[in-house]
């Protein structure tokens, strides 16, 4: 009787140990593919979040941080907004998008050239929200989290 139980346990353990485990592949954020502009926006969001954390530090010194790699990436990314290929080809069919990009670029310049103040940072974020109220509404809640209170 004991040998039957032992034999049965060995068979069960071998059955479960020999099964292949399927590797879970993460689903893409956009099942239709990610456009150049979408990827750039995600990069901007990541870098801006890091900049927000830098500004919120107690001993934040703008003169030290303005040369930070994330500030440099912000400058680099903002210049790519006009050329980046959007998911929706109609996005650039009018001047509306390019005007929003100009406003955003102005706010980034103002932020970086005026001692990196909180109100200039929040103005930059508000320009993001203004554009996203016209295009891609779903990200506004994420952008709002970038504001400094």
What is the predicted role of each segment?
Residues 21-123, 141-149:
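Extracytoplasmic c-type cytochrome modules immediately beyond a signal peptide or single-pass transmembrane anchor
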Residues 5-13:
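Sec-dependent N-terminal signal peptides
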Residues 15-17:
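C-terminal motif of bacterial Sec signal peptides marking the signal peptidase cleavage site
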Residues 124-136:
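The canonical Cys-X-X-Cys-His
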Residues 12, 122-125:
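Processing junctions and N-termini across compartments
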């Amino acid at each position: 009787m004991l040998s039957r139980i032992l034999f049965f346990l060995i068979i069960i353990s071998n059955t479960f140990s020999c099964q292949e485990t399927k590797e879970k592949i993460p689903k893409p954020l956009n099942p239709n593919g990610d456009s150049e502009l979408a990827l750039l926006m995600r990069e901007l969001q990541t870098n801006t979040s890091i900049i927000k954390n830098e500004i919120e530090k107690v001993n934040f010194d703008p003169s030290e941080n303005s040369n930070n790699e994330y500030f440099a990436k912000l400058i680099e990314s903002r210049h790519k907004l006009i050329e980046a290929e959007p998911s929706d080809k109609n996005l650039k069919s009018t001047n509306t998008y390019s005007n929003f990009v100009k406003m955003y670029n102005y706010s980034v310049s103002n932020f970086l050239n005026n001692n990196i103040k909180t109100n200039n940072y929040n103005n930059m974020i508000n320009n993001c929200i203004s554009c996203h109220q016209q295009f891609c509404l779903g990200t506004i809640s994420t952008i709002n989290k970038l504001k400094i209170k």
